[in-house]
Swiss-Prot record:
It comes from Plasmodium falciparum (isolate 3D7). It holds the Pfam family Peptidase_S8. This is Subtilisin-like protease 3. The active site is at 372 (charge relay system), 523 (charge relay system), 701 (charge relay system). The keyword Phosphoprotein does not apply. Residues 303-325 have a biased composition (Low complexity). InterPro entries: Peptidase_S8/S53_dom, Peptidase_S8/S53_dom_sf, Peptidase_S8/S53_subtilisin, Peptidase_S8_Asp-AS, Peptidase_S8_His-AS, Peptidase_S8_subtilisin-rel. Residues 345-756 form the Peptidase S8 domain.
C-alpha cells in the first residue's frame, strides 16, 4: 500500500514538474529510465558485448538462410525464357561469394565492436564525470544558505498551489524557511547527503529552473570602525578587537570629554570615518568662549544672500576653532552635555525649535525597526521604548579568541575545575578564579614560562613530557619524577589547559559587563539612543529625537559588525511582521544583490520607509571598513543605489560646519546627486552605549539615524501619512546650499522647524483645531 501511494505521488509530482516547470530541462520526465541505463553501464561492458553478439548472430543466420534459398533455386529463367540448370562451377562461385561476404561481415563486426567499446567508454566516463559534477555542486552548496524567490509573472505558475508543490519537493532534500511577509525562501542542504539519491538530483534540477531566482548567501557589513581612546597606553584602540572588549566608555555623560576642534585634541575626520573621541572634558569646561549659540533665524534666504558663495552659514563665527590639519571641523557644545549634539546647541538644522513646536502634537506611537548589531535592552535610557527584540545570526560562531587561544567557546568554560590527583599530586582542586598550588613554575627546557602573566600566555602551546617541572610549593624538586610524581604528556596538557582557561576566565570577567547585552559592538545601541533615547535622568541622560518611537530591534550583524544577506532578509521579514513604519538600515556593500533589491521592493509595496546611510569613505588604504571612493556615481553602494529604482528609500550623507559658518559635506562621507537624497549632522554625536554607558562618535550611520528619528517624529504627529507623503514633506523642508548642490539629490539639508510646521499643516482641520 505504501509503495503504491509513493508511486502515485511520484508520478503526480513528476508530471506536474516536467510539464509546467521544466519544459527547458531534458530527461527529467524519463529520469528513472536514464538512471537504469546508467546502472547497466556501470555493471560492466560485458552485457553490451552480449547484446552485440546476439545482434550479429541474427545477422549471420539471416545471411545463411539467404544462401540456402539461393542454392535451392537450381533453375532460373534466362533472358530468353529458356530453363537452364546451374552446374557445379556456379555452386563454387556462390560458395566463394559467400565466404567473401562472411569475411566482410566478420571484419565489419570487429570494427563495429571496437566503435561500440569506444562509445561505451565515453558513456561510462560521461557518467563518472556527471557524478563528480554532482558531488562538486553538492559540496559547493552544502552547509550554505540559498536565497530563493519566484520570478513575478501573471500566469498560473505564480499561484500559491504550484509554489507550494515546488517547495514541497525541494523540502524533501533540505530545510526550507519561508519568509512570508517578503515572499522569500531560505534553503539549506543537510550536512550529510546521499549523492546517489535520485531525489537529490531532481532537487538540483529544480534549482536550475528558470521560474525562480537562486542566490548564494553573502556577507555584508557596516562601512565604519569604532575606536576608543585608551588612557593606559595613550593610543587609539579598535573597539571590536580580538577580545571583543570595550574600554574607556564613560558611565555618565558628565564624564565624557568636550570635543574641541583643535589639532592637539583630536584626529582629523578624514583619518578615521568613525571615531570615538574620549578626551579630558575639563580642559574647556569653564571656557565660555567655546559655547556655540543657536542662530534662531528661519530666514535662510537672507542668510544665503549675505554669503558671496550663496551658501548657507551661521553668522556667529567667533565661537569656532579651526581644525589646522583638515581646514574644516565639526563643532560641539562644550558646556551642556545633553543628548545628541543637535539638541545641545550645534543646531544647524534647528532641531530644538522643531521639537519644541512638535511637543503638543506628538500623539501617535510609531514602530521603528533598527537592523543592526542589536541593543542593550537594559540601558536605562532605552529599555522603556523597546517593544520587540529578535536575533538572526545563523552563521555566527560562539568563539572567544585571546592571542592565539582559538578554540575556547564563550559558553563553555568547563575543564579546569577538576584535575585528578592521580596524575598530579598536590593539585587536586583548582578553582576558576584562583589557582593556588601553582605559585611558581620553573623549567629548564620550556621557553617562555619563566614568568607567566595573565595577559600573555604565548609560547606555552606545547609542554613536552620530557620537560622537568619544579614547583616551590606543591611539586617537589627532583631530577626524575616517577610513578605518581611523574607528569605525563596528557597531564601537561591539563596544566596547559588550566593556564589557558585561567587567562580566558580573567578576560571573560573583564568583558562580562559588555557581553551581558545583545549588542557586543555598540553601533546598534548608539543608533537607538539617537532615535528614541528617553532617559529618566533628565539632563544626565540621552533624550532622542522621537519620544513616541517604539523600537523593534533586529540583530543581523555580529559583534564584528558583519552579517549575511539572509539574516538581513529575515530582519526585513520580522520588521514587516511587526508592522514597522520605518526601517533604519545602516549597512552598505559594493555588490548588487538581487535578493536585497527584491526585498526592498516588497517593503515598498507594504508602504514601509527605509532610511539608509550613504556610506563612509577614506583615502587611507589601511582602513578596511571604509570605501576608497566617495562618489557613488563612480562606485555604487547598496542599498543606497537602489533609491534610483525604488521610491521608499531615503539615503543620507553627513555634513559638518566650517569655521566660517559654511555647511559642507563631511570629507569622509559618500555622496551622489543620483543616489543620495540629503545630508544631516552626524559628527561628534553623544548617544547611548551598552551597559548604561555613553559615547561620542561620528559617521553617516548617525546622519541616517537623525533622519529616521525625524521620520518617526512626522508620523507621530500625523500617522495617516504614507511613505511618499513623508518624503514629500522632507523635500519641502530642505535648505538649499551651493556646497551640497552637486553632492546630494535634493541639494541641501533638512530644517526640522519647517518639517514640523509642514507636518502640522497636513493634519485635518478638526484635529488641528
Amino acid at each position: 500500500m505504501i509503495n503504491r501511494q509513493y508511486f502515485i505521488w511520484y508520478i503526480f509530482i513528476f508530471n506536474i514538474i516536467n510539464k509546467i516547470y521544466f519544459e527547458n530541462i531534458r530527461y527529467v520526465k524519463n529520469y528513472e529510465v536514464v538512471i537504469r541505463k546508467k546502472k547497466n553501464i556501470e555493471r560492466g561492458i560485458g552485457n553490451d558485448f552480449a547484446f552485440i553478439r546476439r545482434y550479429y548472430k541474427s545477422r549471420l543466420l539471416s545471411d545463411v538462410s539467404y544462401k540456402n534459398n539461393s542454392i535451392k533455386g537450381k533453375n532460373r529463367v534466362d533472358k530468353e525464357g529458356d530453363i537452364k540448370k546451374y552446374d557445379n562451377n556456379d555452386d563454387n562461385k556462390m560458395d566463394n561469394s559467400y565466404d567473401y561476404k562472411n569475411k566482410s561481415i566478420k571484419e565489419n563486426e570487429t570494427k563495429i565492436r571496437k566503435e561500440q567499446v569506444i562509445s561505451l567508454d565515453k558513456r561510462y566516463n560521461r557518467n563518472i564525470n556527471e557524478k563528480e559534477e554532482i558531488k562538486k555542486k553538492i559540496k559547493d552548496i552544502q552547509r550554505k544558505r540559498l536565497i530563493i524567490y519566484f520570478k513575478q509573472d501573471n500566469t498560473i505558475l505564480s499561484s500559491r498551489n504550484y509554489k507550494h508543490i515546488f517547495m514541497k519537493v525541494l523540502s524533501s532534500c533540505g530545510h526550507i524557511e519561508k519568509l512570508t511577509f517578503i515572499n522569500f525562501y531560505l534553503y539549506e542542504f543537510p550536512k550529510s547527503i546521499n549523492n546517489e539519491d535520485m531525489l537529490l538530483k531532481i532537487c538540483l534540477r529544480l534549482l536550475e529552473s528558470r521560474r525562480i531566482n537562486v542566490e548564494n548567501d553573502n556577507q555584508i557589513s557596516h562601512t565604519v570602525q569604532m575606536k576608543s581612546y585608551n588612557n593606559n597606553n595613550n593610543k587609539w584602540d579598535n573597539i571590536n578587537s580580538k577580545n571583543n572588549c570595550i574600554y574607556q566608555i564613560k558611565d555618565k555623560i558628565k564624564d565624557l570629554p568636550n570635543v574641541s576642534p583643535s589639532a592637539s585634541t583630536f584626529t582629523s575626520i578624514s583619518t578615521s570615518p568613525y571615531t570615538l573621541k574620549l578626551r579630558d572634558r575639563n580642559k574647556y569646561a569653564n571656557d565660555k568662549n567655546h559655547i556655540f549659540k543657536i542662530n534662531h533665524s528661519n530666514k535662510h534666504k537672507n542668510n544665503n544672500n549675505n554669503n558671496n558663495n550663496n551658501d548657507y552659514h551661521n553668522n556667529n563665527k567667533s565661537n569656532y576653532h579651526s581644525h589646522s590639519s583638515a581646514k574644516c571641523q565639526t563643532q560641539r557644545l562644550n558646556k551642556k552635555m545633553i543628548g545628541t549634539n543637535i539638541l545641545d546647541g550645534y543646531d544647524i538644522i534647528q532641531m530644538e525649535e522643531g521639537l519644541n513646536l512638535s511637543h503638543n502634537y506628538e500623539l501617535n506611537d510609531v514602530n521603528v525597526c533598527i537592523i543592526d548589531t542589536g541593543i542593550d535592552e537594559n540601558h536605562i535610557d532605552l529599555k522603556d521604548n523597546i517593544i520587540e527584540k529578535k536575533t538572526f545570526m545563523k552563521h555566527s560562531y560562539k568563539k572567544y579568541n585571546i592571542d592565539g587561544i582559538n578554540n575556547i567557546e564563550s559558553d563553555n568554560i568547563d575543564g579546569i575545575n577538576n584535575i585528578e590527583s592521580d596524575n598530579i599530586d598536590g593539585i587536586n582542586n583548582i578553582e576558576s578564579d584562583n589557582i593556588d598550588g601553582i605559585n611558581n613554575i620553573e623549567s629548564d627546557n620550556i621557553d617562555g614560562i619563566n614568568n607567566i602573566e595573565s595577559d600573555n600566555i604565548d609560547g606555552i602551546n606545547n609542554i613536552k613530557s620530557s620537560d622537568n617541572i619544579k614547583s616551590s610549593d606543591n611539586i617537589k624538586s627532583s631530577d626524575n619524577i616517577n610513578s605518581s610524581d611523574n607528569i605525563k604528556s596528557s597531564d601537561n596538557n591539563n596544566v596547559h589547559t588550566m593556564l589557558r582557561n585561567k587567562l580566558y576566565l580573567k578576560k571573560k570577567k573583564e568583558c562580562s559587563n559588555y557581553n551581558t547585552s545583545n549588542d557586543g559592538h555598540g553601533h546598534g545601541t548608539f543608533i537607538a539612543g539617537i532615535i528614541a533615547g528617553n532617559s529618566p535622568k533628565g539632563k544626565k541622560g540621552i533624550k532622542g529625537i522621537s519620544k513616541k518611537a517604539k523600537l523593534i530591534i533586529c540583530k543581523a550583524l555580529n559583534n564584528n559588525n558583519a552579517g549575511y544577506i539572509s539574516d538581513i532578509l529575515e530582519c526585513f521579514n520580522f520588521c514587516a511582521k511587526k508592522k514597522a513604519r520605518i526601517i533604519n538600515a545602516s549597512f552598505a556593500s559594493t555588490t548588487h544583490y538581487p535578493s536585497l533589491f527584491q526585498a526592498l521592493k516588497e517593503l515598498q509595496d507594504k508602504d514601509i520607509l527605509v532610511i539608509s546611510s550613504s556610506g563612509n569613505c577614506s583615502s587611507n588604504s589601511k582602513c578596511k571598513q571604509a570605501f576608497q571612493e566617495c562618489n557613488l556615481n563612480i562606485q555604487k553602494l547598496y542599498p543606497a543605489a537602489y533609491s534610483a529604482d525604488l521610491n521608499n528609500i531615503i539615503s543620507v550623507s553627513n555634513i559638518i560646519q566650517q569655521s566660517n559658518g559654511n555647511i559642507v559635506l563631511s570629507p569622509d562621507s559618500c555622496y551622489s546627486p543620483n543616489y543620495v537624497h540629503l545630508a544631516a549632522p552626524g559628527g561628534n554625536i553623544i548617544s547611548t552605549f551598552p551597559n548604561n554607558k555613553y559615547a561620542i562618535s561620528s559617521g553617516t550611520s548617525f546622519s541616517a539615524s537623525v533622519i529616521t528619528g525625524l521620520a518617526s517624529l512626522v508620523l507621530s504627529i500625523n500617522s495617516n501619512l504614507t511613505s511618499q507623503q513623508v518624503i514629500e514633506l522632507f523635500k519641502k523642508s530642505i535648505v538649499q546650499t551651493k556646497s551640497l548642490e552637486n553632492k546630494v539629490k535634493w541639494g541641501g539639508f533638512i530644517n526640522v522647524y519647517d518639517l514640523v510646521r509642514f507636518t502640522i499643516d497636513s493634519l485635518p482641520k478638526d484635529k488641528d483645531e
